[in-house]
Amino acid sequence: MITAKKHPLDNCQLFVQLKKLFHDYNEKVQRLKDMIYWSGNDEHIAKICDQVTDLLVEHDLIIQPPDTMDPCAMNHLRGLLVYLVLNTAHDDIQCESQWSANVMHLCNQLPPIPLFLTIAIAVNCCLMEPLEEFLACGPRWLTIQYFEAFNEALSVINSDCVETLPLLSAALRAAGRAIVNCNLPAENKQLLRQIACMEHRHILDSKQRLHTLPRPSTRKIYLAKAMDHLIEVLLYTLNDPLKREKPNCFAVYSQITEDISDSNSSDPMPDLRHFAQILLDVLQRIFQLVSVDTYMYWHEMKSKSALYNCQELICRQTAELLKVLQSDKLLGEHPVCKQMQSFADAAKTLEQRVAEMRIGELLAFIDSGMATNEELLAGLDNLFSRFIAFGSDECLETMANHLIMLTKKHAQIILSFLGQVVESEMVVEDEGISVTEVNQGDDEDETSSNDDYEELLSLVLRPLFMQLNVEDKMEVLLLRDEQNVTQGFNFKAPDHRERRIRFFNQLDYNKRFPITEFLVLCFENARQTWIDFSHLGVTHTRFSKLFWHIAQSCPKHAAFHISACADNILVNEQLLQKPYALQFTLYLYGHRQILNGLYTSARQLCVSLKDGRCPYGEDELRQAQNRFLDACAYGLAKFIEPMNLPSLQLILKLLKQISLGESNLITRGTAELNALEKEHPKLENGDDAPAVKVAKHYTYLHASLPEWRLKHWKLISHVMKTIDALRWDLATFEDFRVDNLELAVWYWQDGLSHLTFLGTEFRQRILNQVSKLKHKDFWIIYLKEDTLKDTRSFLKLLTQSSAQEANDLFNKLLKKRADCAVMGDLSDAVVKVNSESAFMAFRFLFREYLIAFRSHAKHNKTITKRQHWDHLMAVVAKAPFSIRNEIMELASKAFAVRFGINIQEQQAAKC
């Protein structure tokens, strides 16, 4: 195993062994300084290269055939090349004075090596990549010597013109990058002359020179390879050259000398264009050598691309290069562009090429291991576009083997396909097939299983989702919600429930929220994950804030599942008794406004009247309201039967808070709209400003909320049933029950008490519902005025009333001057029942009587205070004897001081 070398120029065992190798060869075989020319020293050069290769193999830096074995090896190889360069005999006799202090420890370690030997070792011992880096990043006074030596040695290194093309391309690439990395205009001219010389010497760009190759087929192959390499160099050099940063290895080679300069000119493009023109001139001459026969021959030739034959590859490269050249005014005018046009017109894009393949060929291409990343991605994109692949084991295996190449886009393609599957399986009722509804109350039954695509989910979609970043995960979850895919497929891992429970048990609002883990749980079962999160929200204000913070970070996804949280909480007795349940459920009612965005004004959170992160229209807002009110209705229905008063009380308080909250929302919204209209005057054509239009849209929606709510029949009917069930008599009275009745009646009276003004159809629905209720008396009053004719009617209503209803009844009795008689009848009824609940009921009703009496006495100025007091005492005298003193005390505390009565004197007078 290779140990990474952080600092390439540090001394190491490899350098020590290399030093021994060169000294031994210098002393025992051949003195290196006597090797002046390559010619005649071929055998020595080969032996030295073999020994260096063996040394690199020993250190696992290369393997046979010679390739870089591990990315960690590169720093070792870079250091080795610099080590050789520092010990090479250069033409510049002052070069030793140029070395920096950072590399002096490596100098004079070896006998002086001929420059051509250094190049031979680089080419033959897997140091070609470091050599290219050195030529691109090293000091120009030094690298120009290597360009010259490379030019001289190239044909000697390999006499095969085709095989020298990759080496030539490496030198050309390095030259192009050198102009950008170290932009030295004077030195660039020398470099450009050297490049022109190198191309002229080593590229067969004339008919005469081309015919030095013995066979026509070889000539056709050479032309293809030459074009391929030249075009690649041009693309590499001209594709956004100024946007590419210097490579990390630049620092390695910049340490060699003290005087290396990054740039003496701010703009390398003039010299870069000159460099490109030199290559384009050669390319133009090669184009002229391409006959129709050669072009057709290329069609049968394999290329380095697994996707294209040689002809197709050259056409595609030509199209890419032409596009780059035409983006530059000067280079776009080069004559070769006209020659390239016909090739570019015949080019096939990657997408076109993979689309031509049969699915078996496409799989073979993707799995071949020969495709570039760009080609591989095009192949995978095409595979994902063939929906038949999602049901094929072979295709799924190929997808799974290339997960690293897959992105959010591929996950979205899968979900869109699954959405189509779900839609196709949902047949309308008139076709005689019904769709099974999902049991919303059962965690484990949220999704049904579709075995045909189980492997697509487990092998591809799930691991693909895991590797996406947080934002992409949120987008994928949203698309899945929009496609309604969870209704037809099971996304859960076997241990999902255990992990979900553990996640929320360990969640700490003081620590950073583990959003990635949360989104994975949402992928497996979003509905239940949000429900469990909401269970924490009702326990503590900080968990509530955390819930809404996370919901606002993925608002559109959260909007799909928050209604389910309300469905769950409002039928859960334990959750409704949590300390923050009322406030949290109220937020759930307004979740569309919260998710769209809130703002702070005067230290208060206010609803925004503009399109935020989760805009909504009438349909979305009404649907969210209906779902929540349905949940309230279900809660009332569940808790009224066992008379679960604490749970009923919270739901009824919630309904009251909703009514008050809507009123506040409308008031604030109107004020904000007025301010916006002042800030944004009407346009010249008389239209409202865009911001005002949007604000009016939201103001109208918010103003519609009470009307929609009061027309929600399911809730109305259950409120009526709740009121009916909470009605009491003298045997069943209890304060808590009456408190709940008061809340229920308040909600009814807040918007629906004036039934005589309701529409005929709605009024009839109310009447039909009333006919099914046990206690119809109050409903008859609401429906028909002047139905109270005698004291018996009043008594019947009083002994089942809420506080407000009792107060209203006593006001009517006081006006009729029948209060004393009714209180007497009430007292008789209480005595007859003779239970604690009956006496509690009398106390309750008497307190309400005192409230009504206070109002009566305040407004009736025709009677003196003493007369009022005497009337009150007459009513007190009707109280049951066992609690009369208590009733007297209540009356005295309420009115003795007000009427100027001295209770002690009055009691003494009686005595």
Curated annotation (Swiss-Prot):
Coiled coil stretches, renumbered: none
GO terms under cellular component: SMN complex
KO phenotype (gene knockout): RNAi-mediated knockdown is pupal to adult lethal while simultaneous RNAi-mediated knockdown of all 3 Gem4 paralogs (Glos/Gem4a, Gem4b and Gem4c) is larval lethal; this phenotype does not appear to be due to loss of snRNP biogenesis. Conditional RNAi-mediated knockdown in muscle cells or the central nervous system reduces adult viability and results in age-dependent progressive decline of the neuromuscular system; knockdown in muscle cells becomes fully adult lethal due to reduced motor function when combined with a hypomorphic Gem3 mutation.
Protein purpose: Component of the survival motor neuron (SMN) complex that catalyzes the assembly of small nuclear ribonucleoproteins (snRNPs), the building blocks of the spliceosome, and thereby plays an important role in the splicing of cellular pre-mRNAs. One of 3 almost identical paralogs (Glos/Gem4a, Gem4b and Gem4c), resulting from a genomic triplication, that have some redundant function. Required for neuromuscular function and organismal viability.
Subunit (UniProt): Component of the core survival motor neuron (SMN) complex composed of Smn, Gem2, Gem3, rig/Gem5 and one of 3 almost identical Gem4 paralogs encoded by Glos/Gem4a, Gem4b or Gem4c. Interacts with Smn; the interaction is probably indirect.
Note: 'Gaulos' is the Phoenician word for a merchant boat. This name reflects the boat shaped expression pattern seen in stage 7-10 embryos.
UniProt protein name: Gem-associated protein 4a
